[in-house]
UniProtKB/Swiss-Prot annotation:
Structural component of specialized membrane microdomains known as tetraspanin-enriched microdomains (TERMs), which act as platforms for receptor clustering and signaling. Plays a role in various cellular and molecular mechanism through its association with both integrin and non-integrin proteins. These interactions facilitate critical cellular functions, including cell-to-cell communication, wound healing, platelet aggregation, trafficking, cell motility, and angiogenesis. Belongs to the tetraspanin (TM4SF) family. This is CD151 antigen. Residues 40-57, 113-221 are extracellular. The chain crosses the membrane at residues 19-39, 58-78, 92-112, 222-242. InterPro entries: Tetraspanin/Peripherin (IPR018499), Tetraspanin_animals (IPR000301), Tetraspanin_CS (IPR018503), Tetraspanin_EC2_sf (IPR008952). Glycans are attached at residue 159.
Amino acid sequence: MGEFNEKKATCGTVCLKYLLFTYNCCFWLAGLAVMAVGIWTLALKSDYISLLASSTYLATAYILVVAGVVVMVTGVLGCCATFKERRNLLRLYFILLLIIFLLEIIAGILAYVYYQQLNTELKENLKDTMVKRYHQSGHEGVSSAVDKLQQEFHCCGSNNSQDWQDSEWIRSGEADSRVVPDSCCKTMVAGCGKRDHASNIYKVEGGCITKLETFIQEHLRVIGAVGIGIACVQVFGMIFTCCLYRSLKLEHY
């Protein structure tokens, strides 16, 4: 009877080892996906960060990159701990899983909270940023972001093209008689912003605030879903690790 129980325990341990190994392979790929989403956000979707008053959007992306790197390292450690049957490595693996779990939950929560606050932030800050910093010394990033925003989303100003009447650049005389930036034009050529007729600029299409809000919210949903989704998967990894740790402990005795 004792021999049967021993074989049963050994069989259970082997099954847990292969289950955890399979999980770690999937976990490593998930880490790659998390890191890719973070890098994708920073590299391709961060053009408009200079227009945001808060750094939450940027912080969320960085958290995902860090979490993704740690996940990939942890996945390799998990495979080593599983096949070497080292309980000290399993403890370290569990702790790292817990840290990553918390990082991804934080990223998901930040994305959700910022998603709720974004409309208020843009209403309070976007117009001021555009009219006070556009083409001002030291704010080249803002100028580039505004031009790209207006061209990409076919809009002009924060709420509408009239916002540019308050622009420090327009009022300074440096605008060379322009009433709106050239990036407001449907066909962008040098000096086209001197004529603000609806046939020339994005006047009836409205301002950029709603379009920028929609753009950022879409990416916050992706960030939040990836963070929370991978965190939920990690719960299974922690359960498998605890089971294998307990199984090895029983075999030891």
